[in-house]
């Protein structure tokens, strides 16, 4: 009898694990239909997944020192250790940051892409590099529950996208080294600026002797080796510029075999959650992306946001599947609003939490209980009756602290914030 009960328990556990794995493959776009039937109406599990990965992308914005008066402008305010706890992530122990990622660029970019210290700020931490995000891995408990070890790459976006969007050139260049010609497509081309941020390096900067691309690929390789006996997944996420970098990073990993490990040569599935993403590449890039196995991308687009369509469709093509949301349907947000609110990541996540479909008659209901105050972290979007100040996410006293002699000095970062 005891043996029968033990076998029954083990069988039930196995079936639960199998069902969980199959469900994850579906919500991560890994099935043959790539989210077909899950977007309108939005599947409950997928809704939570988008918010979770969106929050991991939001952490990069929350940690960025953006004030040019600081010698550390363009760096992270916090060290990797307990990083997600310091940015007040909703589940700070679910992932552990294993590496920071830094980028530079060999071409001129809009100033908003990479905030830098002003000349008057004094000795700058770097004159060339910017902190561009991090790599993290799921904690043991999360991995055990999910039946897989999730590796996340979170790419930083820009706070002033409306400014850079109008100053963005439309130059396409071959995506050499990222993705090449294949069956059904010729050499893909991508936006020059996005590619430059992803692939540029500078031997004069200690942070970019390796490009952002090389840093991420090396860390993914290391983590896949460290967890070689576990089922793994790779999820890339980002907002705005970060979403464009996520798109490049995702296809790069698969096209060049960085998701294949060990003698089994079994590929690890790669999923990108790209929020408010501008278009990245041409029609050949689209063909390559949409034809590549073990690669899925979900673009989340807010209907009034101008950034996803700022690069002309005659030259640049959308890739992956699209989830369309509309912040104008939320009864909690000010209406009319403006481009800054429409593009803001917290506003996007609010829309994901409440969207009831893309049709004309679809309503809005916060089926995910997400704090309304988050909407006003960086913008003034929440209706006044909720009594939440605009742009409230600021460092106490703007990073000014009183030293032992009683004088106020700038101390806007913690020790170890420049870790690699």
Swiss-Prot record:
Compartments where located: Secreted
Pfam family, one: Lipase_3
GO cellular component: a single term: extracellular region
Enzyme class: hydrolase
A biological-process GO annotation: lipid catabolic process
Name this polypeptide is given: Phospholipase A1-II 3
Coiled-coil regions listed: 367-388
Keyword Secreted among record annotations: yes
Active site: 240, 305, 343
Domain of life of the native organism: Eukaryota
First and last residue of the signal peptide: 1-21
Family: Belongs to the AB hydrolase superfamily. Lipase family.
Enzyme Commission designation: 3.1.1.-
Transmembrane segments: none
Biological function: Acylhydrolase that catalyzes the hydrolysis of phospholipids at the sn-1 position.
PANTHER family for the chain: PHOSPHOLIPASE A1-II 3, PHOSPHOLIPASE A1-IIGAMMA
Residues bearing attached sugar chains per UniProt: 231, 294, 403
Gene Ontology MF annotations: phospholipase A1 activity
InterPro entries: AB_hydrolase_fold, Fungal_lipase-type, PLA
Keywords from the UniProt entry: Coiled coil, Glycoprotein, Hydrolase, Lipid degradation, Lipid metabolism, Secreted, Signal
Keyword Transcription regulation included in the entry's annotation: no
Species: Oryza sativa subsp. japonica (Rice)
């Amino acid at each position: 009898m005891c043996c029968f009960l033990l076998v029954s328990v083990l069988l039930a556990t196995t079936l639960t694990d199998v069902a969980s794995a199959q469900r994850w493959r579906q919500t991560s776009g890994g099935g043959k239909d790539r989210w077909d039937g899950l977007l309108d109406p939005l599947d409950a599990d997928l809704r939570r997944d988008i918010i979770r990965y969106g929050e991991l992308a939001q952490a990069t914005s929350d940690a960025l020192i953006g004030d040019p008066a600081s010698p550390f402008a363009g760096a992270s305010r916090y060290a990797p250790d307990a990083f997600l706890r310091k940015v007040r992530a909703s589940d700070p122990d679910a992932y552990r940051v294993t590496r920071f990622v830094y980028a530079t660029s060999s071409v001129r970019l809009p100033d908003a892409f990479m905030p830098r210290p002003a000349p008057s700020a004094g000795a700058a931490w770097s004159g060339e590099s910017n902190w561009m995000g991090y790599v993290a891995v799921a904690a043991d408990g999360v991995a055990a529950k999910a039946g897989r070890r999730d590796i996340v790459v979170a790419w930083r976006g820009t706070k002033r996208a409306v400014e850079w969007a109008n100053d963005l050139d439309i130059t396409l260049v071959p995506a050499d080294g990222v993705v090449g010609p294949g069956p059904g497509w010729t050499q893909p081309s991508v936006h020059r600026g996005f590619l430059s941020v992803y692939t540029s390096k500078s031997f004069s900067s200690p942070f970019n002797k390796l490009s952002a691309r090389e840093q991420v690929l090396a860390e993914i390789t290391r983590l896949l080796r460290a967890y070689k006996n576990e089922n793994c997944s790779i999820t890339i996420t980002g907002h705005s510029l970060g979403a464009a970098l996520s798109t490049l990073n995702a296809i790069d990993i698969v096209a060049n075999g960085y998701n294949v490990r060990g003698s089994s040569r079994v590929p690890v599935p790669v999923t990108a959650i790209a929020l408010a993403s501008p278009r990245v590449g041409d029609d050949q890039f689209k063909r390559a992306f949409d034809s590549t196995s073990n690669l899925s991308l979900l673009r989340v687009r807010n209907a009034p946001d101008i950034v996803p369509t700022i690069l002309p469709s005659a030259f640049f093509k959308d890739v992956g599947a699209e989830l369309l949301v509309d912040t104008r349907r939320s009864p909690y947000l000010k209406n009319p609003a403006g481009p800054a609110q429409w593009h803001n990541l917290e506003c996007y996540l609010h829309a994901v939490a409440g969207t009831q479909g893309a049709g004309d008659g679809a309503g809005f209901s916060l089926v995910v209980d997400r704090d309304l105050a988050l909407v006003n972290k960086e913008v003034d979007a929440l209706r006044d009756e909720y009594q939440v100040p605009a742009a409230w996410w600021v460092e106490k006293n703007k990073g000014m602290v009183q030293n032992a002699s009683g004088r106020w000095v700038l101390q806007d970062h913690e020790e170890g914030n420049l870790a690699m």
